[in-house]
Amino acid sequence: MLALESPLVKLKKLFEIFNFSFFFIAFIYLFLSIFTSFQAFKINEFYSELNPDINGIQFEEINFKNKFSTSLNGWWVEGESDNAFIILHGLRSNIGEKFYIDLISEFNNLGFSILAFDFRNHGKSGEGKFSFGVEEVYDVDASIKYIRENKNIENIFIWGFSFGATTGLNYSIYNTKGSDVSGIIADTPYYDPIEVLIDEVSKRTPLNSYLSKLLKPGIIISSKVFFDNDLENIKNIFESETINNTPSLIFGCKNDTTVPNSHPRRIKKKLGAMSKYVEFENCSKHGDSFIYNNEEYIYEISNFLNEQFEIKNK
């Protein structure tokens, strides 16, 4: 006859199972938090060698430095007016991609000069701290100073996509006087990079949305520990009491799963009366709005620009 286990032995086994489960879950939690942080701060080294010449656009290779002496590589395209656009590319991208070159052509056809440059850690530019658009505002500031000091330009507008859009808007919020730029066009900016990262975890792992959200504290802490970066900074900037004085046109994509339309909608709400929100339905993924809605996209931009010129001339 088998001897029955004593309550003490059973309790010991339960304790061992509990310990194993706890440490296993903790290990998985730490692994996913750290892995997500490292993936978030990993910049793709891919560089496209295309330039505006493929569209028959003449350009000048330029180089300037931000306040940290980081070398920033770019192009200058001369326009017919004294107005200019600064092109701010997306994350893990560079100005040599055809998407941006086609935009340069569109803006140049409107008579604008264009300064397009690679952010730090991207393309041919130098290395620097990556912060999802917080410290990158100094790259934007350097591009504006380059134009003011070297070109005969009166009105400067910013067009940015995703990471570039959020960075451009952050610059306008920092710049409380609103005098450096005449307007910002932000194509699918993100409101909170942590949300974007958590959504990616739920799409790429067996974890559902609820379980992925539990990783938020771990991702925030590991980003601070390993990269000296507070991922809540972007959201805090948008939720600050700073009043935005720069007119902004914000684009969203109804079917965007990378940066869902809830992000640009919240940004529009934050920026208030100085902003306008346009949402495109004919887009299947992040960055499709310009490609599949070209005429409407440029039409909205032209109207926005004309409104700013009319206000200025009153």
Where are these regions (language model features)?
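Catalytic histidine-centered segment of alpha/beta-hydrolase-like enzymes
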Residues: 283-295
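An N-terminal hydrophobic leader/cap segment in hydrolases
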Residues: 14-65, 75
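Conserved alpha/beta-hydrolase
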Residues: 104-126
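Hydrolase active-site cap/lid region
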Residues: 173-230
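Catalytic nucleophile-loop/oxyanion-hole region of alpha/beta-hydrolase
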Residues: 95-96, 120-151
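Short beta-strand/loop motif that positions the catalytic acidic residue
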Residues: 243-244, 249-252, 256
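The serine-hydrolase catalytic nucleophile loop
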Residues: 93-105
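Short alpha-helix in the alpha/beta-hydrolase fold that links the catalytic acid
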Residues: 260-269
